[in-house]
Amino acid sequence: MDSRDRPIGFFDSGVGGLSVLKHAIAELPNEDFLFYGDCANVPYGEKTPEEVRSLTMSCCDLLYKKGAKALLIACNTATSAAIHAMREKYQMPVVSMEPAVKPANLSKKPGKILVMATPGTIASSR
């Protein structure tokens, strides 16, 4: 199957990533999308990194098997626990939302930045 005909896979530990998907649909109207929200195992924040990695890989394996040409991880906890393993395993782009925090933190604009994160994300070296 030509990659232009394959969907972009979205993964989140729940349904919060639907807001990200909504923006992607608006920005990329000619793309197809698959969304997997792991509501059966939410919340991920208090799980061990190994549990989060296993759950994330399982969910993303399904998106991969369904033909996803790229994966967007909308869960920062999943990103911190599994992004390296995912990039090693899948021969496609794997991106996440988490890098947006870094430029905001480095911004020269005065003011405060609020970061809401789970214990698993805060404990991560990312």
What are these regions (language model features)?
Residues M1-R126:
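Non-catalytic structural scaffold of enzyme domains
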